[in-house]
């Protein structure tokens, strides 16, 4: 195995082409001067838009800036032989209607469900020769209770009730994801007909209220309170509380003590895969295979997808209606509608002529909170990490915990808060929160034989360092070394196993994937930027102040994650408008 690692290191150094290109240039035919609809950006939401509109008979073209489709849902061979889900790395939130409507299995989508799904190893200094404890959670409730009982018998008894409580809340929120938010603009200043139509947008909200019933005040607290307050009402053991709290802060520049952090937790528990509520899994072939399946569904019905075609400007006619886009090379492409999968900031502050948008609207867009705590590190290793709390098997084959989200520096909610406080001072966390995943444990072809791809989703790292200092190569390497040192404490030998690494700080995530501030949700999933306030109040229904322009990415309702709901909802809104044009 070690010899294999040395050979791989030589290959990495010698490779002139470190990226696995999945080009879709001119998929669906050559560039035409006019389409019914143009989509800016081939992220998963943009591809979902194209697939739905094309199925509805709307001739659609997608223009992508990069050489590869998928936005943040991509597979790239950054290190020769190692195929990484370079940004997004897990699947759960994709709406079930999209699986079936777009026939994604028919178009090649294959999943690896994870069970167990969560592993939190302890360090427990002073344990002598004893193996440190760990917390392993999966779909077997009785086994979960045994695991939790190591830390608290009371928590073990309560855990099933907590899971049922959260499941009920997720069930109530679910209908809100698949429809445009309540149309407040129509209620306030629409015609009588518009006001009557807008009443239909109340149905999902009323349905949610019926499901929650008399428990509504308690559920309201979950959405508005700090997650520590919520978890303290249920549990006493820190390893369990900290493990659950990681889902409340992941991707968010917030502490577990921040009011409203409970919603982000809910956002990450309301998914499911293949009928299993709350299940998370790996896409076979990496996240890019999901984007490929959606693209295949779109192009099979006639959509056109173009890579390395950057949209420079949204075109507007003299009457204030969208009439297409201009590409970076000067090519004009006409269309009746334009749907933007890019962030609200890029869409409205860079691509759209400012004179056609209200000043107040532009000001609100410029004020969106896009702070990001995330640095993603993709690592190629020549063997599986062996954790002190769960040593490897003699032959090094994957064990159940290797398929999990492995939570490091997460034994106590205080550790999460301290990591956050460092970033508030402009410093990368001294002891970063780390979610370590090894997708090749279930999908071996992602790496050479005996080797593995490791995803390190870490926080907190500010966009700008203390004193206004920008990230440079030295700072990036120093932070990655710190993360590796942390992993080494839990899994000795990890650093020696490393073949290569790809470090993506917040500025890197912004530059490569167009994520403003490096924010994986396009803008924060805080209560003031959700539902009918996403991206801004009175413009949450995918339509924009400019007729014919729609927002269909993560900056629109219901927000970030590989969900596809924003794309699906926006496609239906645009289609209804097209029918009346």
Swiss-Prot record:
Q: Name one GO biological process term.
A: mitochondrion organization
Q: Which PANTHER family match?
A: PHYTOENE DEHYDROGENASE (PTHR10668), PYRIDINE NUCLEOTIDE-DISULFIDE OXIDOREDUCTASE DOMAIN-CONTAINING PROTEIN 2 (PTHR10668:SF103)
The annotated subunit structure for this chain is: Interacts with COX5B; this interaction may contribute to localize PYROXD2 to the inner face of the inner mitochondrial membrane.
This protein's source sits in the domain of life called: Eukaryota
Query: What protein family does this chain belong to?
Result: Belongs to the carotenoid/retinoid oxidoreductase family.
User: Which keywords does UniProt give here?
Assistant: FAD, Flavoprotein, Mitochondrion, Oxidoreductase
Q: Which Pfam families match?
A: Amino_oxidase, NAD_binding_8
Q: What is its EC number?
A: 1.-.-.-
Residues reported in the UniProt entry to bind FAD:
38-71
Q: What name does UniProt use for this protein?
A: Pyridine nucleotide-disulfide oxidoreductase domain-containing protein 2
> What is one term from the GO cellular component aspect held by the record?
mitochondrial matrix
Would the keyword Flavoprotein turn up in this protein's UniProt record?
yes
Q: Name one GO molecular function term.
A: oxidoreductase activity
| Location of this chain's protein in the cell | Mitochondrion matrix
Q: Which InterPro entries match?
A: Amino_oxidase (IPR002937), FAD/NAD-bd_sf (IPR036188)
Q: What does this protein do?
A: Probable oxidoreductase that may play a role as regulator of mitochondrial function.
Encoding gene per record: PYROXD2
Keyword field contains Chloroplast: no
Top EC class of this enzyme: oxidoreductase
């Amino acid at each position: 195995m070690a010899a294999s690692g040395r050979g791989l290191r030589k290959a990495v150094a010698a490779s002139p082409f470190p990226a696995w290109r999945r080009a879709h240039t001119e998929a669906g035919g050559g560039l035409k001067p006019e389409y019914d609809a143009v989509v800016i950006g081939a992220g998963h939401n943009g591809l979902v838009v194209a697939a739905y509109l094309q199925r509805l008979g709307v001739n659609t073209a997608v223009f992508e800036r990069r050489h590869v489709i998928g936005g943040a849902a991509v597979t790239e061979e950054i290190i020769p032989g190692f195929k990484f889900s370079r940004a997004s790395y897990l699947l759960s939130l994709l709406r079930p209607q999209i699986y079936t409507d777009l026939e994604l299995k028919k178009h090649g989508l294959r999943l690896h469900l994870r069970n167990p799904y969560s592993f939190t190893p302890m360090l427990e200094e002073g344990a002598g020769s004893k193996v440190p404890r760990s917390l392993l959670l999966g779909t077997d409730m009785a086994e979960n209770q045994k695991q939790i009982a190591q830390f608290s018998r009371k928590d073990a008894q309560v855990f099933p009730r907590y899971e049922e409580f959260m499941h009920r809340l997720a069930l109530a929120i679910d209908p809100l994801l698949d429809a445009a938010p309540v149309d407040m603009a129509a209620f306030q200043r629409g015609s009588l007909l518009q006001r009557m139509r807008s009443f239909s947008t109340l149905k999902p909200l009323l349905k949610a209220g019926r499901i929650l019933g008399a428990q509504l005040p308690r559920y309201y607290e979950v959405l508005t309170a700090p997650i520590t307050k919520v978890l303290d009402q249920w549990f006493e053991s820190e390893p369990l509380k900290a493990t659950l709290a990681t889902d409340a802060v992941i991707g968010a520049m917030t502490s577990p003590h921040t009011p409203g952090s409970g919603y982000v937790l809910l956002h990450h528990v309301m998914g499911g895969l293949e009928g299993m509520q709350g299940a998370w899994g790996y896409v076979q072939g990496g996240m890019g295979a999901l984007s490929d399946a959606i693209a295949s569904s779109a192009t099979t019905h006639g959509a056109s997808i173009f890579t390395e075609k950057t949209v420079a400007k949204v075109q507007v006619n003299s009457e204030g209606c969208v009439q297409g886009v201009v590409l970076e090379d000067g090519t004009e492409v006409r269309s009746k509608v334009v749907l933007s999968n890019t962030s609200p900031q890029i869409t409205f502050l860079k691509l759209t002529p400012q004179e056609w948008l209200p000043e107040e609207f532009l000001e609100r867009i410029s004020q969106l909170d896009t702070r990001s705590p995330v640095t993603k590190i993709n690592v190629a290793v020549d063997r599986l990490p062996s954790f002190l709390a769960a040593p490897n098997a003699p032959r090094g084959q994957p064990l159940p915990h290797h398929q999990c989200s492995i939570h490091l520096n997460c034994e106590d909610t205080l550790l999460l808060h301290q990591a956050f406080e460092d970033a508030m001072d402009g410093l990368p966390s001294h002891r970063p929160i780390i979610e370590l995943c090894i997708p090749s444990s279930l999908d071996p072809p992602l790496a050479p034989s005996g080797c593995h791809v490791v995803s390190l989703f870490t926080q907190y790292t500010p966009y700008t360092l203390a004193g206004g200092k920008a990230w440079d190569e030295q700072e990036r390497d120093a932070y990655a070394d710190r993360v590796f040192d942390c992993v080494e404490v839990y899994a000795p030998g990890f650093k020696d196993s490393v073949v290569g690494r790809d470090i993506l700080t917040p500025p890197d995530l912004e530059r490569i994937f167009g994520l403003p501030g490096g924010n994986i949700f396009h803008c924060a999933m805080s209560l003031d930027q959700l539902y009918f306030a996403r991206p801004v109040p009175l413009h949450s229904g995918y339509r924009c102040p400019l007729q014919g322009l729609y927002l269909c990415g993560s900056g629109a309702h219901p927000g970030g994650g590989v969900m596809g709901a924003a794309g699906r909802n926006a496609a239906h809104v645009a289609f209804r408008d097209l029918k009346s044009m």
